[in-house]
Amino acid sequence: MWKADQWKDYEVLDTSDGEKLERWGSFYLVRPDPQVIWSTPRQDPRWKRFDARYARSSTGGGHWSAHHLPEHWCIHYRELTFQVKPMNFKHTGVFPEQAANWDFIDDQIRRAGRPVSVLNLFAYTGGATLAAAAAGASVCHVDAAKGMVAWARENAAASGLSGAPIRWIIDDCAKFVEREIKRGRRYDAVIMDPPSYGRGPSGEIWKLEKDLF
């Protein structure tokens, strides 16, 4: 089993009754987690002095209850820097568990001993993109959401990778791949972490079971 055990700015402190208590840098967040099906005593005092808590609504969605929480702040993983921004549907812009994959990407690229080109699809805020670029690869970062690509570029700048060979593409991933095939473009590695549901830049509806499987 791979473990994302190199974090210093993130940790799961406790879990109980469908929620997890996390530390993101110097801030404590409480977020729902459907995998937490057990009920245990909440003995950690930080359950009561969290900086923000996301509560689901019975009608769908939910909202954050925040106490003196900034709009965004930065956390670090090894040499990478990420902006954390609590947003809709409990997300923060970073999936800390993906760090195990970032370590794998870093290792494979460094061991290749030659230039490596990577295509990162559904690239979100750029965790895998930054890991690949920091290891020396040239990366094509593709996501349908303009805001996510802008956020990824901010993460790259914060990580000292503004000058890295990264192509930033706002496009429907499937359509982009079709065009790359027609152009005869080849990559050494393709990374994909698609959402189960989403929308393209022109409002196209994406469903994992329909559009990928």
Regions found by a protein language model. Name each.
Residues T125-A137:
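Conserved SAM-binding loop of SAM-dependent methyltransferases across substrates and taxa
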Residues K146-M148, I170, Y187-F213:
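Mobile active-site "lid"/loop adjacent to the S-adenosyl-L-methionine
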Residues S26, V116, D188:
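Conserved acidic residues
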Residues S138-D143:
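Conserved SAM-binding motif I beta-strand of class I
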Residues Q6-E22, L29-P96, D103:
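Non-catalytic substrate-recognition/targeting regions of SAM-dependent transferases
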Residues A144-I191:
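S-adenosyl-L-methionine
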Residues G113-Y124:
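Conserved class I S-adenosyl-L-methionine
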Residues P96-R114:
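Conserved alpha-helix/loop element of class I SAM-dependent methyltransferases that forms part
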